[in-house]
């Protein structure tokens, strides 16, 4: 199966792990993703239906607009990728517009622009909920037209919702399969990157997610696959699951020389 890339750049995106994740995802009628992120697993699987959720309202707004107004969105977004908008002055003007706009369609256009023009494609907000990633200084940011159209085509069988992971997992019924890609447990005290939205993801949340996954698999017979870093802590959280270790390359790092392979853990409850 050809691998399809997401149209967004995303911290911890699962494109490099798609083959391994597909190998361990059980068959079912509907795939539920409480942490959809850039959607690489959704884009590279073939379930009859999808329920795709995230706590980031900007992300879900963008996905619904790409699904419902594909041609308009591609046409209008392309104009923001002209050379005249690829400089720091324009970037910060458009970032300010994004942070003050309440118009969903315009916010969706600007969210894609910011994602492709900001530093490392990071998605980060301050405590006021304002997007605050600096300008990335890329020579020619890529406009993901082909990826947008593929996403829209796949979205015909998908429902996008902005909600807490517990509410999404509560939708799981017979025939469903759940894939969870929560904000990763930190490898070290300085490696924590969970503030991609104003709602941070705590150790208690990680433990609660593991408990909920175990509960779903036992009480509702719904299989749940979770991905995370392979650490003593995550192995303890997922002690009731079958564990599979995968090598992957973490691509978001402040120190380029520090970009090395770390073990990833796939925990399957079934």
From Swiss-Prot:
PROSITE patterns: N6_MTASE. Keywords: DNA replication, DNA-binding, Methyltransferase, S-adenosyl-L-methionine, Transferase. Signal peptide: none annotated. GO terms for biological process: DNA replication; DNA restriction-modification system; methylation; mismatch repair. It holds the Pfam family MethyltransfD12. InterPro entries: Ade_MeTrfase_dom_2 (IPR023095), DNA_methylase_N6_adenine_CS (IPR002052), M_m6A_EcoRV (IPR012263), MeTrfase_D12 (IPR012327), SAM-dependent_MTases_sf (IPR029063). Its EC number is 2.1.1.72. It catalyses: a 2'-deoxyadenosine in DNA + S-adenosyl-L-methionine = an N(6)-methyl-2'-deoxyadenosine in DNA + S-adenosyl-L-homocysteine + H(+). One of its GO terms (molecular function) is S-adenosyl-L-methionine binding. S-adenosyl-L-methionine binds at residues 10, 14, 54, 181. Disruption phenotype: Loss of N6-adenine methylation of 5'-GATC-3' sequences, more sensitive to multiple mutagenic agents. Belongs to the N(4)/N(6)-methyltransferase family. PANTHER family: DNA ADENINE METHYLASE. Overexpression leads to hypermutability. May be involved in methyl-directed DNA mismatch repair, initiation of chromosome replication and gene expression. This is DNA adenine methylase.
């Amino acid at each position: 199966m050809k691998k399809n890339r997401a149209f967004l750049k995303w911290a911890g995106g699962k494109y490099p792990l798609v083959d391994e994740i597909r190998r361990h995802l059980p068959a079912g009628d509907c795939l539920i993703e409480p942490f959809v992120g850039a959607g690489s697993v959704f884009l590279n699987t073939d379930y009859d239906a999808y329920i795709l959720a995230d706590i980031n309202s900007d992300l879900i707004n963008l996905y619904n607009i790409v699904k419902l107004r594909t041609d308009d969105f591609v046409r209008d977004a392309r104009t923001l990728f002209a050379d005249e908008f690829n400089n720091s002055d324009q970037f910060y003007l458009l970032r300010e517009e994004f942070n003050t706009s309440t118009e969903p369609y315009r916010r969706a256009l600007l969210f894609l622009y910011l994602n492709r023009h900001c530093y490392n494609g990071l998605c980060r907000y301050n405590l006021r909920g304002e997007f605050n990633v600096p300008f990335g200084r890329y020579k020619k940011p890529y406009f993901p037209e082909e990826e947008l159209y593929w996403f829209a085509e796949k979205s015909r069988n998908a429902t996008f919702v902005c909600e807490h992971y517990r509410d999404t997992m509560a939708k799981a019924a017979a025939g469903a399969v759940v894939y969870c890609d929560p904000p990763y447990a930190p490898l070290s005290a300085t490696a924590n990157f969970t503030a991609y939205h104003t709602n941070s993801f705590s150790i208690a949340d990680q433990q609660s997610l593991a408990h909920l996954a175990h509960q779903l698999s036992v009480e509702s017979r719904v299989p749940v696959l979770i991905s995370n870093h392979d650490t003593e802590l995550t192995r303890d959280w997922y002690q009731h699951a079958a564990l599979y270790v995968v090598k992957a390359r973490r691509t978001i790092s402040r120190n380029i020389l520090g970009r090395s392979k770390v073990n990833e853990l796939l925990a399957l409850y079934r």
